[in-house]
Amino acid sequence: SSSLGVTSFGIRVFSTSSVSHVAIYLGENNVAEATGAGVQIVSLKKAMKHSDKLFVLRVPDLTPQQATEITAFANKIKDSGYNYRGIVEFIPFMVTRQMCSLNPFSEDFRQQCVSGLAKAQLSSVGEGDKKSWFCSEFVTDAFAKAGHPLTLAQSGWISPADLMHMRIGDVSAFKPETQLQYVGHLKPGIYIKAGRFVGLTQ
C-alpha cells in the first residue's frame, strides 16, 4: 500500500516503487502492521483509511496452522517499537542498490549484487535480540516464524517493493522462497509513473 504523506512519497522515490508499506491481514477484519507507532493490530477499515491505494497479495500454499502462528507472532510483539535505525540505514541502501538493476546484468547477478551491498551497508541483528521492526521487516519475520519464509534474505534487507515483486510473473531483487499471488485492489489509488500521477485499476 501507500499514502499521500511525505514519508510514503520519500520511500517510493528512493525505492523507485509505487508502494511504501506492507501489512498482514489476519482475518476477522484485523490487520497487523509496523508503523511509526510501532507494531500494532488494527481494523481493516483503519488500515484502508490511512492508505491511498491498497492491493492484496496472497501466499497460495499457506496452511491454517501457519496462519495461526503468524497471528500469534503479531500478538506476541504487539506494541513493540518501530525500527527507525533500520529505516535510516535503508535510505542510502535503496539508492546504491539501483546500480545492481542495470539491464546487462543477469537475475542471479543482480540478486548477488544487492545481497552484497546489504551485508556492507545494513546492520545485522539477531532474531532473538530484536525489539523493533519496520513494516516489511515485520512481514518477512512473521512468515519466517511460521515456517513459511518468503525469502531467505535477512528481514532487515527487505523493502515493501521487494515483497511486491515476489509475486508470480515478476522479478525481485531477492530470491523468493514463495511466489505471491495477486488477488486484487481494495483501493486503486494514485501511482507515480514517468514523472506524472496516473490512476490504475489493476
Name the predicted role of every residue range:
Residues 1-202:
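Cysteine-nucleophile amide-bond enzymes
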